[in-house]
Amino acid sequence: MTKRNPKLAALLSVIPGLGQFYNKRPIKGTIFFIFFISFISVFYSFLNIGFWGLFTLGTVPKLDDSRVLLAQGIISILLVAFAIMLYVINILDAYRNAERFNRNEEIKDPKARMVATWDKTFPYLLISPGTFLLIFVVVFPLIFMFGVAFTNYNLYNAPPRHTLEWVGLDNFKTLFTIGVWRKTFFSVITWTLVWTLVATTLQIALGLFLAIIVNYPVVKGKKFIRTVLILPWAVPSFVTILIFVALFNDEFGAINNDILQPLLGVAPAWLSDPFWAKVALIGIQVWLGFPFVFALFTGVLQSISSDWYEAADMDGASSWQKFRNITFPHVIYATAPLLIMQYAGNFNNFNLIYLFNKGGPPVSGQNAGSTDILISWVYNLTFEFNNFNMGAVVSLIIGFIVAIVAFIQFRRTSTFKDEGGL
């Protein structure tokens, strides 16, 4: 039997399909060759314009829309990346087929070969629609946002009236060196972190406390109590937030007029005072978030074997010792990834911040409200002030912070260590 040179097969595959012909696989070689010829003939013009637009962002105002050119450039990059991936597959396929032939592992029967090929490629065919959807719904917008962060896209340079320009790191310099931007950014990110840590920790603590109380053996009517405690979760958060806005209204809200004023003689300005607005937001988020945590912890608590507690009782353990050494470690071990996602979700909790008072009240000398978090500030920068480039910069920072923190925390959880993840 004549041996085949795998390196020669790979070298011949520089011209797509030629390596497959060398390996006596004419059908596969023809498919590779036709695909790449078709790719070049169909997309050559689009790729030419796409890469030109990506580098120049247009040269003639009103005629060249920089946004469209940027989008075409990104799509061109994705198409070329896809073509390169298939090109590498073409080379590797030729190399591996030659190796299999030399080891006498090549399937001789053409029909059996087609069946084997189908079995290998079928899983990839199944996931391909979802993969393409992911690319154009998630990856493409992220790359577009990344590109906008390095342009001068704002109200005064908006296309198609003007063409955009690449400005490098100027937008990042503006955020960290210009007084009003620097002051606003650090004020907003400080409140974002405080809001995330305090609100999420309180909702988790309340959910855990209630789950332990309801799960206590002497408590009667557990089903009814659990149903009542989960009800806030059943009501759409949009509706709940609007109800709380009315309750916290400075002038006619029931919290001031019917509770605090008659009982304590005080009427905090919940919507117009920065401190009390933050207190109200944290309280509302605790109300909105604790039912999910309560339901989560309830399920975990019921999975803990009673034998553990009986053994602890025999050893003379107190209630606190049983909680510290049995209940709490077991609950955290089982729910750590979901609890981390609670923090990540509140870090980007746009709905509550915007619906309550649109990030207000305003702050003198800043271009963000006193209760704006990073995500609501991005919304205002983008849709209220048309400052798209700065909105994209802040969005990149948000994504970077969330990704790094989540990655570190996931790696530290026992659940992922035990499963060999990350």
Feature locations, PLM:
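Hydrophobic alpha-helical membrane segments of integral membrane proteins
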Residues: 30-31, 393
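N-terminal signal-anchor/first transmembrane alpha helix
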Residues: 3-8, 13-16, 22, 26-27, ...
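A conserved catalytic-core signature of glycosyltransferases
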Residues: 16-17, 369
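A structural signal for multi-pass alpha-helical bundles of membrane permease subunits
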Residues: 46-54, 60, 123-422
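Hydrophobic side-chain positions on well-ordered alpha-helices
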Residues: 20-21, 382
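Amphipathic alpha-helical interaction segments
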Residues: 41-45
